[in-house]
Amino acid sequence: MASVSTWSGIRNKLENDYLCPALRGHIQYFATSYSKSADHEGRAAIRMDGVEVLRSNYYIYFENVWTKFHHLRSTTLKDCDSAKEAIDQAHAFALEQGTFDQKVFYEAFGIFDNQSIEKSLVSENPLVRIFALLDRRLGKRRLLALEESMEQELDWVRAFYVIRMQAEGLMDRE
């Protein structure tokens, strides 16, 4: 697939090419970078009818990464060779906590856009799994078949499964 380099191109693909018909006009993807912040850091969100269901920003993400990194370096990964391992684990931990910045959001889209729906559904990256849950290529039967595995899913990812199930009329709205 061709690379999409602009936010408007990414948003267009997510909202028009990939998003299931039942959620079109309801789900909006948002990302921005702030020109006056160092390195143009920013935030990203997924909105449902204008309400941010999932949101995070660089500063929350950065705080979670560095807190976890310093914890790992002072406990289980003390030697110098483990610094890269510690930072990789810290980034993964922060993402599992539902924190990310717009760059992580863009990277997740890049992964999602360049692999099959099957791989996206089982991706290590929770944002990729969310994109897959909202994808038009995920049919109702397969959506229903995911119910058991969703019990083990992160709460903030499972919320998008519920949104999709309700939109498809497969689950009552609470």
Predicted segment positions?
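Alpha-helical scaffold segments
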Residues: 1-174
